């Protein structure tokens, strides 16, 4: 899980979702997981 100021999709399978007022990226590839901090 990477904590970033700006989250973006890295590949085609990445999905932007909103959880507890935070933008997150979930993907089948664990390296692509991101959370906005």
Swiss-Prot record:
One of its GO terms (molecular function) is structural constituent of ribosome. It comes from the Eukaryota. It is found in: Plastid, Chloroplast. It holds the Pfam family Ribosomal_L36. InterPro entries: Ribosomal_bL36, Ribosomal_bL36_sp. Coiled coil: none annotated. GO terms for cellular component: chloroplast; ribonucleoprotein complex; ribosome. One of its GO terms (biological process) is translation. HAMAP family: Ribosomal_bL36 (MF_00251). Belongs to the bacterial ribosomal protein bL36 family. This is Large ribosomal subunit protein bL36c. It comes from Psilotum nudum (Whisk fern).
């Amino acid at each position: 899980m990477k904590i970033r100021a700006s989250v973006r999709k890295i590949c085609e399978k990445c999905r932007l979702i909103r959880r507890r007022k935070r933008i997150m990226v979930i993907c089948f590839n664990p390296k692509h997981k991101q959370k906005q901090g």
